[in-house]
Amino acid sequence: MSVPAFIDISEEDQAAELRAYLKSKGAELSEENSEGGLHVDLAQIIEACDVCLKEDDKDVESVMNSVVSLLLILEPDKQEALIESLCEKLVKFREGERPSLRLQLLSNLFHGMDKNTPVRYTVYCSLIKVAASCGAIQYIPTELDQVRKWISDWKLTTEKKHTLLRLLYEALVDCKKSDAASKVMVELLGSYTEDNASQARVDAHRCIVRALKDPNAFLFDHLLTLKPVKFLEGELIHDLLTIFVSAKLASYVKFYQNNKDFIDSLGLLHEQNMAKMRLLTFMGMAVENKEISFDTMQQELQIGADDVEAFVIDAVRTKMVYCKIDQTQRKVVVSHSTHRTFGKQQWQQLYDTLNAWKQNLNKVKNSLLSLSDT
């Protein structure tokens, strides 16, 4: 991608024009180019560029795109420090003012660089920070498949990979993109190994709390397989997660009674937890029983007789359970329920179902063939 230049002249003259422009705006900068070469000129120009960020947007974008175009023609070994310096300026400029302009400038730099250049990591992290500060994360690429490819292309160290994913997660959370944020956090936790899983305690803890707090999240068994989460076994947060994975409402109530302060410290609301555990308990009941009496529901879900119908309607809205109410016989008839966990037993059931379909299709095929022969 080509980046617009400040003016169509040689690099040396362009640097001199930039120096003169910045000096005219009050920068303490010589108009004469440095004897050290273009990279030294750019270092001094970037250091002084704050003054032009106060000007009209068109002037600023033109000037800064000129800086970007000069950066892009430097040798890679001279680019990194200068790009880091420019990114720091754009991220920290005047406590978040003019975010759309800063996003545009960073985007021009990011897309103007060679796709495999490792320093694109710095620019992308800066893009995330600025986008998060103004709630504009939707305007930068955050698709997980693309991020994975960049991590590979840029040959990031484990530490930088974790930093990027953590930064992206926090930005998505701040911008209320909870589904995307959850996927990024699972990606982050899944990137740890047995050797370094203990370093991810904070991330694992945060992932669990975020998942339990999400009003649209109901399946949590995949979290138990993540190494950093396994490292939390024996702690209250892991016990709580296990309850939400497979236990019933009564288990949660008992846990809450014994650990009320802990639940409160997580920022989780007890009533929201109760509502979610009622649904999860009902899902488990619906998997095992195709008909559930109102009395059983009242007992297991700890609700009154007048609340059963409203509860079922809300449960169906989540699409976790499909059922209908039989008012006459005071029962719920289940047509389908999502399994809370998907282990060996569920895989076997799926295999048996698919195998039965295959056999039935073969029978139909053979019947059709026999008809065509007659």
Curated annotation (Swiss-Prot):
MF (Gene Ontology): translation initiation factor activity; translation initiation factor binding
Q: What GO cellular-component annotations does this UniProt entry give?
A: eukaryotic 43S preinitiation complex; eukaryotic 48S preinitiation complex; eukaryotic translation initiation factor 3 complex, eIF3m
Q: Which UniProt keywords apply?
A: Acetylation, Cytoplasm, Initiation factor, Phosphoprotein, Protein biosynthesis
Cite the SUPFAM superfamilies for this sequence: ARM repeat, Winged helix' DNA-binding domain
One family from Pfam that matches here is eIF3m_C_helix
> What region holds the PCI domain?
180-339
Q: Where does the record place it?
A: Cytoplasm
Modified-residue entries (N6-acetyllysine), positions: 254
Task: Identify the InterPro entries for this entry.
Answer: ARM-type_fold, COPS7/eIF3m, eIF3m, eIF3m_C_helix, PCI_dom, WH_DNA-bd_sf
Phosphoserine modified-residue sites: 2, 152, 367
| Keyword Acetylation belongs to the record | yes
Q: Which residues form the signal peptide?
A: none
Q: SMART domains in the record, alphabetically? A: PINT (SM00088)
One of the GO BP terms on file: translation
Q: Which family does it belong to?
A: Belongs to the eIF-3 subunit M family.
Which PANTHER family does this one have? COP9 SIGNALOSOME COMPLEX SUBUNIT 7/DENDRITIC CELL PROTEIN GA17 (PTHR15350), EUKARYOTIC TRANSLATION INITIATION FACTOR 3 SUBUNIT M (PTHR15350:SF2)
**How does this protein assemble?**
Component of the eukaryotic translation initiation factor 3 (eIF-3) complex, which is composed of 13 subunits: EIF3A, EIF3B, EIF3C, EIF3D, EIF3E, EIF3F, EIF3G, EIF3H, EIF3I, EIF3J, EIF3K, EIF3L and EIF3M. The eIF-3 complex appears to include 3 stable modules: module A is composed of EIF3A, EIF3B, EIF3G and EIF3I; module B is composed of EIF3F, EIF3H, and EIF3M; and module C is composed of EIF3C, EIF3D, EIF3E, EIF3K and EIF3L. EIF3C of module C binds EIF3B of module A and EIF3H of module B, thereby linking the three modules. EIF3J is a labile subunit that binds to the eIF-3 complex via EIF3B.
Q: Tell me the function of this protein.
A: Component of the eukaryotic translation initiation factor 3 (eIF-3) complex, which is required for several steps in the initiation of protein synthesis. The eIF-3 complex associates with the 40S ribosome and facilitates the recruitment of eIF-1, eIF-1A, eIF-2:GTP:methionyl-tRNAi and eIF-5 to form the 43S pre-initiation complex (43S PIC). The eIF-3 complex stimulates mRNA recruitment to the 43S PIC and scanning of the mRNA for AUG recognition.
The identity of this protein, by name, is Eukaryotic translation initiation factor 3 subunit M
Quote the gene name from the UniProt entry.
Eif3m
